[in-house]
Amino acid sequence: MKKELNHPLINFGKTGVLIINLGTPDSTGWLDIRKYLKEFLSDRRVIEVNPILWKIILNVFILNLRPSKTAKAYKEIWMKDKNMSPLKHYTENQAKKLSKLIGNEERIIDFALRYGNPS
């Protein structure tokens, strides 16, 4: 491969590997579910309708009615011993196992969630 004369020198250093998943609420509590739903459903890439109409629907109806139903569903799958959702648990474990397998000083492996914590 031919090197460009005006291309800056690239210093190679550490490499980061980030395993990202959609996200999950912090708990099965009504407020945590509401906070998560608000963050997720406020993303214009998730809901592509008229933003003014959507804000009314979201804030008047969904964020007042949906957290109770969603909390009930999360309680059925919630990992009580770890106090986290399976999605967060398995995403975090994948990052830890991958880090043990191929991680080193130059290769840092971690995880994040798009919505919720850690994001």
Task: Give the positions of each predicted feature.
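Active-site-proximal alpha-helix that buttresses catalytic centers in soluble enzyme cores
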Residues: 2-119
